[in-house]
Amino acid sequence: MTRTTLTATKTVDGTLGYGDTFTVTAKSQGTITWLPAEGSTITRGHAVYSVDADRRPLLYGTMPLYRELRDGVEGKDVELLERNLDKLGYDGFDVDDTFTWATREAVEDWQEDLGLDVTGTVQPGDVVVADGRIRVAELRKPLGDTASGPVLDATGTTREVTVDLDVADEHLVRKGMKATVELPDGATVNGKVKSVGKVATETTSGNDTTTTVEVKVSVGGLKQPYDAAPVDVTIVSEQRENVLAVPVGALLALAEGGYGVQVVEGAATRYAAVEVGMFADGKVEVEGVPEGATVAVPK
């Protein structure tokens, strides 16, 4: 008997993709005159689409613009605009929640650089706000269509795996757990549990009903150009380090109850009762037999 590390794993089906999809909606009059290619990535300050040849740039933030931003306006939306202008290299103003004359001058410089009408004000439909870089998943409008309603569907730019995990297995996973993701070509990449959903969803297929929670797994080192793919996700649900373990086949049911092992001592053998712990990898954690002892495994 020697000390070892036992690792229990659970393998489940997952789907590799770019996470949740959201819709970019136009809020202005005019005609769609430019659209990005599906699959392209758009970063801060670059156009998401164009209306009447005027670009609608991307700003980073979590609050959509809902009113005209102009001199004297105060609020979190002003701070969002100023922070983006600062990141884009415009200066001369304080990044705070107040739209001042200095903010107006920065907006005018920005509008001039974009080739827009220089007004010094920003309307809600003039920009697109997202929490970071976006990837164009699907175009919802053709060129020449009216600039109102859904224009395109987008996602984030980081690939992740979504798993619909049976609620019976929910106790096996928690945020931060390590995972291994096997791709369709057999290659594997490392992952980590990013989130475990709090809402259970019931799905019926024929006579079978399953209840699942959504688990997100972040992945790194992906070289394969999959936009979406079915994958196998192996999650390390439990790990015990530096424990004494024997092959499961070495366990014997004792007449008095419980389990034991057959200890080999030279030409003699004896039975020793043991307390069992974790089972994994065809082995079982045991206590009650000293390290270095030899145990018999029945054939």
What does each of the following model-derived ranges do?
Residues A168-E202, D208-E214, A255-Y259:
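Beta-strand/loop subdomains of soluble extracytoplasmic proteins
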Residues L222-K299:
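Edge-of-domain interaction segments
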Residues T21, A53, V196-E202, A253-E256, ...:
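Short, conserved beta-turn/loop elements at beta-strand boundaries and strand-helix junctions
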Residues A37-Y90:
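Long, charged alpha-helical "stalk" segments
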Residues V193-Q239:
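Structural microfeature recognizing short secondary-structure transition sites
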Residues R3, A8-V12, Y18-T43, L58, ...:
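Short beta-strand segments of a lipoyl-like beta-sandwich/carrier module
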Residues L165-A187, V219-D232, P290-A293:
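Surface-exposed connector loops and short turns at secondary-structure junctions
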Residues L69-D117:
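A short amphipathic alpha-helical interaction element
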